[in-house]
Curated annotation (Swiss-Prot):
Name assigned to this protein: Meiotically up-regulated gene 110 protein
Subcellular location, record wording: Membrane
The species this protein was found in: Schizosaccharomyces pombe (strain 972 / ATCC 24843) (Fission yeast)
Role played: Has a role in meiosis.
Taxon lineage: Eukaryota, Fungi, Dikarya, Ascomycota, Taphrinomycotina
GO cellular component, as recorded: cell division site; cell tip; cytoplasm; membrane
GO biological process: meiotic cell cycle
Amino acid sequence: MVESSDENDQASSFASTEDLKELRFVFWFSVLIPIFFIALIIIKRYHSCTYQKNRLLRSIFCCMSIDDEEELETDMYDLPIVEPSITLPKYSASLQENERLVGIEGEREGIDVVLNFSKAGEGGVNPYPSFDTPNARILQLRQLAKLKKHGPRISYHGIGIGRCNGNRVLPPYPEPALLPEAPNTREASNNTYLYGFSNNFINISRTLNLRYPSASASISDSLPPPYQVLSVPSVTSTHAFSNNANQT
């Protein structure tokens, strides 16, 4: 009886140890396999995002794949420059009258096409339901004109409203402007020539004292790099011209 009880205890202990081993194996298998796949995903996404900045954490914790994100992203400066593919309303008599009024009042603000819809009763679906009345566009332009007169002077073309290509607004082209400084002095340099608005360029260019370089000074010392002198009048030709003027 004693031997049988000892054998039973050994068998039960052996079975319990085997059960513990199986439980440990199942536990570590269920833990390590997901960790292994997560590590593979992290390595793959890290390899895909090495050429892009600040996207490692986003690629790891985001549910969307990197390829789908790259397909959804659009380079606004890589789109082809084509005609705007926008559906315009029917060009009715009321629309023509509204455009004529807007053109006469001078409130177009650099807009190429004034979008207004026809009056009620002419048929068709209202393409602009946000406008309450057909004259809402004119009222909006009048309000812009009031703000422009009484508010601060803002160059609307300088913030990109003037260049509209389809469904996006592009940044404006830079326009050169000069500082009120004589360009032919020795102090003039590349810092003299800035980028600004055209009205500043016109106003400042009137105050510039443009003069020819002296015959004794070299061209490189008298002119800044942006200018190219094609021909410099010689001293003899200048004296000859002055003598002819005195004789006449």
